[in-house]
């Protein structure tokens, strides 16, 4: 381990030496750039583009291009990037992460690699965590890029499709991570090429990269449509679980945040709902509603996981503390919370398209990111995204005083001490930023400060719209600001007059977060660019982290020291090590979970990429899809004939082939059993393909010209692909939940998921080709046929990381079962074989 760390440190030093050399080359161009007029400086952009087109690489253009941006920034913004910012810019261009401390000017650092990579004409995306930052940076930095002759676009939720398309076609596009992901999904749901907005994904710089690629990595973006399910069952399930008692009727595992009924709870459910067996197949819907009602009532907490405003349940982002407008928990959890809170229950939704940030951002040709806290997650960035983390030195030494943690026995004694500390600093005039992990805590502390007559501002999910204004004033003399995790990331807290003499900004943490990174972000609000500052964390044995991990040893330690007073306080290196050890364990668990989820997600990623690529080929086709369509017809015929001719020739099911031909390929009674006798299997295939070709030609002639034929082909293919794909997403989701239970049978759930997922995908492809064949060959031709989306979807927020963990560990004794409508004996088998049900899967029914 020691050798590994030594090697890493040596590599960092070597990389810094390389960056210094390139920075020297940039510096060498400074005086020449200073001599140029504004017009000459602007003309450099066209010169660079021409040199790039002639074969010069971006790496070769870098020193001069960075020098141009540096000089332009001085003239337009009044800012001249320091050497450390040049080094950070080089790291970003290389597709890595420069770890730069708060206040070191990451926004300005990004302008140089953004400009350089925009010269290729393939587009650069600058990604921020919220629309405020995207709008601010596109306006402020846009002046610089416009001065240099580059176009800048802003992509936010309120933009129309035309405005989004225009923004994506700019040289540089500012956007939020959510909007990029949703636009990608929407582009793969449209039915006309003209409706697409994105270009191929080229180069992205992700601001606050740890927040997006680590904290939100497992968060899937979901486009959903309405599913037809009754909301009454949510109310019944909610009424039932509210009467249950913990430990007697249900049990909660605090560490994994899972919940399940006990035997007594199951018996109560069976009595209440009049059932013999709660986990019978017919009761799948009820068990699902009960599971979600349990989680809604006893796992999901008001003012922590969500808030209720204007009679609506609104999700609170666990990592930023912001309300996530327009987002809903999926899989019925949101409806269960609505039932719990007594607000109107909205219709349940069905997933139509989904992708995680991990898989979206891995599609870029080159990916880079910026943050002040990435080194603790360096392994994850390297393993999953193939990105290195390089620590960039600060422009000035950090003189902030980071004090050891203070431990109190109870929450009450801890908060009393916090209020006393704030009161003392307030009367002195020193500005204070207090970090809390939840809305609930910020409001509790606010009440205590009101009682102590200390004026203050509260920044949490309930008033996030005032964020910029609150943070702007947080460094003024006598300011007291309480903030949840977001703490105004991306917005600098600038110190007011006279604050330096008072010791700078004081940061107080009211408890440790699960991640050391989030704690470091809070500390980093103070002491920017060599300013003085102080940080202090207050902890109690009743904090969530302490209850979940390692508090027993600390309790023993307190007993040994005979600490009994309510307001006793401890500062100890042993205690600090315990806390950091607990945090490392949580970080390790979370990383393992994210890695595991990614392995599952990769199965869907491969399938999604194939489907989306084929879908795009159909939409982009401008001449003819007849070969594609006839290819589907031939493969469908091949599959059906093979399935009916597997046995000895005397036992071939020729009746089944005739049934298939009549229902799917040709007019009824045009092919008989006699036509197929005395032919080999290959000859039967050729015969059916020839007859299908005749019908195909006949259909083609019914349409007025090649253009209408192409349009009809697109309508048929897109409609079938979209319907089958959304069903497949649901089926894969159910498979994923069910394979988790197979671990009990000594089977590897991931291998089972990969194997069955591959089989289900092949079945879906066969089903698509069968349905396209049937629809094209048997449908009535209409002249005015138009493409339509299968359903109109809306963006939906999935459950958070903790919820996902809980879902994957559900302790109920059932597997999701897909119940289809009843099939008649003489109907075609729904498997797509073309046989009658009685001759196929219904043979043993």
From Swiss-Prot:
Its membrane topology: Peripheral membrane protein
Enzyme kind, highest EC tier: translocase
InterPro entries: Helicase_ATP-bd (IPR014001), Helicase_C-like (IPR001650), P-loop_NTPase (IPR027417), SEC_C_motif (IPR004027), SecA (IPR000185), SecA_CS (IPR020937), SecA_DEAD (IPR011115), SecA_motor_DEAD (IPR014018)
Species of the source: Enterococcus faecalis (strain ATCC 700802 / V583)
Free-text function comment from the UniProt entry: Part of the Sec protein translocase complex. Interacts with the SecYEG preprotein conducting channel. Has a central role in coupling the hydrolysis of ATP to the transfer of proteins into and across the cell membrane, serving as an ATP-driven molecular motor driving the stepwise translocation of polypeptide chains across the membrane.
Protein name: Protein translocase subunit SecA
Family: Belongs to the SecA family.
Disulfide bridges in this chain: none
Catalytic activity, as annotated: ATP + H2O + cellular proteinSide 1 = ADP + phosphate + cellular proteinSide 2
Gene3D superfamilies the UniProt entry points to: Helical scaffold and wing domains of SecA, P-loop containing nucleotide triphosphate hydrolases, SecA, preprotein cross-linking domain
PROSITE patterns assigned to the protein according to its UniProt record, in alphabetical order: SECA (PS01312), SECA_MOTOR_DEAD (PS51196)
GO biological process: intracellular protein transmembrane transport; protein import; protein targeting; protein transport by the Sec complex
Positions bound to ATP: 85, 103-107, 492
Cofactor(s) named in the record: Zn(2+)
């Amino acid at each position: 381990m020691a050798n590994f760390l030594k090697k890493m440190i040596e590599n960092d030093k070597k990389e810094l030496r390389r960056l210094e050399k390139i920075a020297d080359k940039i510096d060498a161009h400074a005086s020449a750039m200073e001599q140029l007029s504004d017009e000459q400086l602007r003309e450099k952009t066209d010169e660079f583009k021409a040199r790039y087109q002639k074969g010069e690489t971006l790496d070769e253009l870098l020193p001069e291009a960075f020098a141009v941006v540096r000089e332009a920034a001085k003239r337009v913004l009044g800012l001249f990037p320091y050497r450390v910012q040049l080094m950070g810019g080089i790291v970003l261009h290389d597709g890595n992460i420069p770890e730069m401390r708060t206040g070191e000017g990451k926004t300005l650092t990004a302008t140089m690699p953004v400009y350089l990579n925009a010269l290729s004409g393939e587009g650069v995306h600058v990604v921020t965590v919220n629309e405020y930052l995207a709008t601010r940076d596109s306006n402020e930095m846009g002046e610089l890029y416009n001065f240099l002759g580059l176009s800048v676009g802003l992509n936010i939720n309120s933009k129309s499709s035309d405005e989004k398309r225009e923004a994506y076609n700019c040289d540089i596009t500012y956007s939020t991570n959510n909007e990029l992901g949703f636009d990608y999904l929407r582009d793969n749901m449209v039915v006309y090429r003209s409706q697409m907005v994105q270009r191929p994904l080229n180069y992205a710089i992700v601001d606050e990269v740890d927040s997006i690629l680590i904290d939100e990595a497992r968060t899937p973006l979901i486009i959903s449509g309405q599913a037809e399910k009754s909301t009454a069952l949510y109310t019944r399930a909610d009424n039932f679980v509210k009467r249950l008692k913990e430990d007697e009727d249900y049990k909660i595992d605090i560490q994994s945040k899972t919940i399940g009924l006990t035997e007594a709870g199951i018996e109560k459910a069976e009595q209440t709902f009049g059932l013999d067996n709660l986990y019978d197949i017919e009761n799948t819907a009820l068990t699902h509603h009960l599971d979600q009602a349990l989680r809604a009532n006893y796992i999901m907490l008001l003012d922590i996981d969500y808030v209720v405003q204007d009679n609506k349940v609104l999700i609170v982002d666990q990592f930023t503390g912001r309300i996530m407008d327009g987002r809903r928990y999926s899989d019925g959890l949101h409806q269960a919370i609505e039932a719990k809170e007594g607000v109107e229950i909205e219709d349940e939704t069905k997933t139509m398209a989904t992708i995680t940030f991990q898989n979206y951002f891995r599609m870029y040709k080159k990916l880079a990111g910026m943050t002040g806290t990435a080194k603790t997650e360096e392994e994850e960035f390297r393993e999953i995204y193939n990105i290195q983390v390089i620590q960039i030195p600060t422009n000035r030494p950090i003189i902030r005083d980071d004090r050891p943690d203070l431990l109190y026995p109870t929450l009450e004694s801890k908060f009393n001490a916090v209020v006393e500390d704030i009161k003392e600093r307030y009367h002195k005039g020193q500005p204070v930023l207090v970090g809390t992990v939840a809305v609930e805590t910020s409001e509790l502390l606010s009440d205590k400060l009101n009682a102590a007559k200390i004026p203050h501002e509260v920044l949490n999910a309930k008033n996030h719209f005032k964020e910029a204004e609150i943070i702007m004033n947080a460094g003024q003399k006598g300011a007291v600001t309480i903030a949840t995790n977001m703490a105004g990331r991306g917005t600098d807290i600038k110190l007011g007059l006279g604050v330096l003499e008072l010791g700078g900004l004081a940061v107080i943490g009211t408890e440790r977060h699960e991640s050391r990174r989030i704690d470091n972000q809070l500390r980093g609000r103070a002491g920017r660019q060599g300013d003085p500052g102080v940080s202090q964390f207050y902890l109690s044995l009743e904090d969530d982290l302490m209850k979940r991990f390692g508090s027993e040893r600390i309790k023993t330690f307190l007993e040994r020291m005979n600490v009994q007073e309510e307001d006793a306080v401890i500062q100890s290196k042993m205690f600090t090590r315990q806390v950091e050890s607990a945090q490392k364990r949580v970080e390790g668990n979370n990383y393992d979970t994210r890695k595991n989820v990614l392995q599952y997600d990769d199965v869907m990623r491969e399938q999604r990429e194939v489907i989306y690529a084929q879908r795009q080929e159909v939409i982009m086709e401008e001449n003819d899809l007849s070969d594609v369509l006839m290819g589907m017809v031939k493969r469908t015929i091949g599959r059906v004939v093979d399935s009916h001719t597997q046995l000895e020739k005397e036992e071939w099911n020729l009746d089944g082939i005739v049934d298939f031909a009549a229902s799917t390929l040709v007019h009824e009674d045009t092919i008989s059993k006699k036509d197929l006798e005395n032919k080999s299997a290959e000859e039967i295939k050729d015969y059916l393909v020839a007859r299908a070709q005749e019908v195909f030609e006949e259909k083609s002639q019914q349409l007025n010209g090649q253009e209408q034929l192409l349009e009809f082909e697109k309508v048929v293919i897109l409609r079938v692909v979209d319907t089958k794909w959304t069903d497949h997403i649901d089926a894969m989701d159910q498979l994923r939940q069910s394979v988790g239970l197979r671990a009990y049978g000594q089977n590897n759930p991931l291998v089972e998921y990969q194997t069955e997922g591959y089989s289900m995908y092949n079945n879906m492809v066969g089903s698509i080709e069968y349905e396209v064949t049937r629809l094209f060959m048997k449908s009535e031709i209409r002249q005015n046929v138009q493409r339509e989306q299968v359903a109109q979807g809306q963006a939906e927020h999935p459950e958070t990381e903790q919820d996902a963990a809980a879902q994957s560990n559900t302790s109920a004794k059932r597997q999701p079962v897909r119940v289809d409508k009843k099939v008649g004996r003489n109907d075609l088998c729904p498997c797509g074989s073309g046989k009658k049900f009685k001759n196929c899967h219904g043979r043993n029914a």
